[in-house]
Design a protein with these regions (language model features):
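N-terminal helix-turn-helix DNA-binding module of bacterial transcription factors
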Residues: 1-80, 370
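Flexible loop/turn connectors
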Residues: 2, 269-270, 274-370
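Glycine-rich phosphate-binding loop signature in dinucleotide/nucleotide-binding domains
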Residues: 64, 139, 199-201, 271-277
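Short acidic capping loops at alpha-helix termini that bridge into adjacent secondary structure
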Residues: 202-203, 251, 303-308
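Alpha-helical recognition/docking segments in bacterial nutrient-uptake
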Residues: 1-23, 83-86, 91-198, 370
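Short acidic/polar active-site loop segments enriched in Thr and Asp
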Residues: 35, 82, 142, 201-203, ...
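Hinge/beta->alpha junction and helix N-cap segments in small-molecule ligand-binding domains
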Residues: 90-103, 122-129, 150, 181-191, ...
Length: 370
């Protein structure tokens, strides 16, 4: 009997004697005429193995119907799953509709690709949809990146720390053991507000991001811009409001009832329908600014001739049809920084938090009041 025939017969015997007749990596190695450790190298992206040997091992695997090493067994052996959890604001569906989230995830993916790890997107919302909490509790992730912040995120941190899972936050959450990629919200909004004041505006309304856990609801009431400021948990919202108040202490604000354009338009409408409407609206992000433009157009209000509208983020909004006056933050780069922080933490090193710069971008939506 030839050597190849003996190998095939030996493998057939292994298949009959193994549980449920399953094929193992040792079976593949025997058929390919290599050691089990050499056969395992064919399924890794790194390792010293010649192309010819890899091809022979994969041919043997195909002949035996072997799909590859059990990822759970590999995870148990290495202590790594090769998965990084990424928690987004609200639902995953809405994250894919958000240009800020998309640009950040693109940068994050670019950096994580270099680490040869996969990503698991998790929703940050709470009831009636449970969100990330029950998923993360038993999920074998190597690290978690938060693209959101708030009470629901803070509640997850103790469990992750107890499991010694590295945590990275983009604009939060802030706390012990969290590496944060931040931007200078206060400086950016302050510079933007001073620009608007320099144009001559004094009657100003602030269109505020929602602080609600639930997805949808009516706009909030018109209140002074600084009312209840310290009670706002979201640091980004709070810092941008504080900066606007420092320049326009008499400004008013309205909170959007949700994250979509319709919710922002409804909130902007509340400001525009006031007996003495503002001559300028400072929106806390570019999507809210787009909503304000829609609300103005629906009322025949010209921008910037009759109304100044500004945003924050510098998001890619080609469908807007005009260049928005806004504050640009490095959306792609903050994702890259977050991914590199993950790499540092997985390597057992310390990842220092960073504050990235922002800049004022003048566009076509701001002018002196009529």
């Amino acid at each position: 009997m030839r050597v190849g025939e003996r190998a095939v017969n030996r493998v057939s015997g292994m298949r009959r004697n193994s549980p449920r007749g399953s094929v193992t990596l040792a079976d593949v190695a025997a058929l390919a005429g290599v050691s089990t450790s050499t056969a395992s190298l064919a399924y890794r992206s790194t390792g010293s193995i010649t192309p010819a040997t890899r091809a022979r091992i994969l041919r043997a695997a195909a002949e035996l119907g072997y799909a590859g090493p059990d990822p759970m067994a590999r995870s148990l052996k290495s202590g790594r799953s090769g998965i990084v959890g990424v928690v987004v604001a609200g639902s995953i569906r809405r994250a894919f509709q958000n240009p800020v989230a998309l640009a950040t995830m693109a940068g994050l993916s670019e950096a994580l690709d270099e680490l040869d790890v996969g990503q698991l997107l998790l929703p940050g919302r709470r009831e009636p949809h449970a969100g990330a909490a029950p998923l993360l509790e038993g999920m074998p992730v190597d690290a978690v990146v938060f693209l959101t912040r708030g009470e629901e995120v803070d509640a997850l941190l103790p469990g992750l720390r107890a499991r010694r899972i590295p945590i990275v936050g983009v604009e939060g959450p802030h706390g012990d053991g969290v590496a944060v990629v931040d931007i200078d919200d206060a400086r950016g909004m302050g510079e933007l507000a001073r620009h608007v004041r320099g144009l001559g505006h004094r009657r100003v309304g602030v269109l505020m991001r929602t602080t609600r856990i639930e997805e949808d609801g009516p706009p909030g009431p018109v209140v002074p811009v600084g009312q209840g400021l310290e009670e706002i948990v979201n640091r980004t919202i709070r810092e941008r409001l504080r900066a606007a108040r420092s320049v326009f202490p008499d400004a008013v604000r309205v909170e959007a009832g949700g994250r979509d354009l319709e919710a922002g338009e409804a909130a902007a409408g509340v400001l525009l329908d006031l007996p003495s409407p503002p001559t300028a609206i400072l929106a806390q992000n570019d999507m809210l600014a787009a909503s304000a433009l829609q609300a103005a157009a629906a009322r025949g209000i010209r921008v910037p001739e009759d109304l100044t509208v500004t945003g924050f983020d510098g998001a890619d909004l080609p469908w807007l049809g005009r260049r928005l006056t806004t504050v640009e933050q490095p959306l792609h780069d903050r994702g890259v920084h977050a991914g590199r922080m993950v790499g540092e933490l997985l390597a057992g090193r310390t990842a220092a938090s960073v504050v990235l710069p922002v800049r004022l971008r003048t566009g076509e939506t701001a002018a002196a009041p009529a």
